[in-house]
């Protein structure tokens, strides 16, 4: 579904990603893990079109993604849940979700999508008229994920969804991602610093360090790798 091949990308001609290749198949849950500064968020910004790569290719369902303007990429079925949630604080919860349903697919499936979102996150239904800026951090993260789902995506990209959350709330977010995948067969690409939880949730993983993929494999393979265990799992 998503093929990233030998991407070099960065800012002001300074590369952050140095020849990164990542493939995500239909229905897969893929995690990209690594330390701060590894280039994980830059990878997502490159897929979304915020950052223009210096070289390499990205295709989505056979379409050359780099030839598509950033504003058009969500219409292909790509939803990006950004780092830091970035909800619209002066809009209500429901209005934020409506903002997510701006694609034709999202508009067509609005009723079923909103029912699914409220089933996954009942607190959003309870607070549908509340301003998003008054929600807790965990509730805002639920809203950000719900907003992504409202577009009826084929690929859901989540950038550090556990950032700044209490452990119990972060665990709930990971459990919900697994449930979303189980219910919808949605393709999920996750960037995350909580390596143990990310690899436990995903089918396949990539370890990104200093802008390069240094390891890849199934979740079981990576969790058993001595380098991953020592560097990220505290074993």
Can you say where each PLM-predicted feature lies in the sequence?
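The feature captures the beta-strand-to-loop junction immediately N-terminal to the Walker
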Residues: 33-35
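Helix-to-loop junction immediately C-terminal to a conserved catalytic motif
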Residues: 48
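ABC-type ATPase nucleotide-binding domains, specifically the catalytic core motifs of the NBD
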Residues: 12, 68, 93-112, 120-125, ...
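ABC ATPase C-loop
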Residues: 148-149
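Helical segment within the ABC ATPase nucleotide-binding domain
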Residues: 171-185
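Conserved ABC transporter NBD signature motif
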Residues: 56-64, 76, 110-114
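Conserved ABC ATPase signature
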Residues: 131-135, 139
């Amino acid at each position: 579904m998503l093929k990233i091949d030998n991407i070099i990308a960065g800012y002001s001609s300074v590369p952050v990603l140095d020849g990164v290749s990542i493939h995500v198949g239909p229905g897969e849950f893929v995690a990209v893990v690594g330390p701060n500064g590894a280039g994980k968020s830059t990878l997502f910004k490159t897929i979304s079109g915020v950052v223009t790569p210096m070289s390499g290719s990205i295709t989505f369902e056979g379409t050359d993604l780099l030839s598509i303007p950033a504003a058009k990429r969500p219409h292909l079925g790509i939803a990006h849940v950004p780092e830091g949630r970035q909800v619209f604080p002066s809009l209500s919860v429901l209005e934020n979700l409506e903002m997510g349903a701006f694609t034709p697919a999202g508009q067509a499936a609005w009723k079923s999508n909103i029912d699914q979102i409220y089933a996954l996150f009942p607190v959003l239904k309870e607070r549908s008229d509340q301003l998003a800026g008054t929600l807790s951090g965990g509730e805002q993260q639920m809203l950000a994920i719900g907003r992504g789902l409202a577009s009826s995506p084929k690929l859901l990209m989540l950038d550090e969804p556990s950032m700044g959350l209490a452990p119990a709330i972060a665990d709930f977010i990971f459990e919900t991602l697994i449930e979303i995948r189980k219910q919808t067969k949605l393709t999920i690409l996750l960037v995350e610093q909580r390596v143990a939880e990310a690899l436990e949730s995903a089918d396949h993983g990539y370890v990104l360090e200093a802008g390069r993929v240094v390891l890849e494999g199934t979740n079981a393979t990576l969790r058993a790798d001595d380098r991953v265990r020592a560097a990220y799992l505290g074993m």
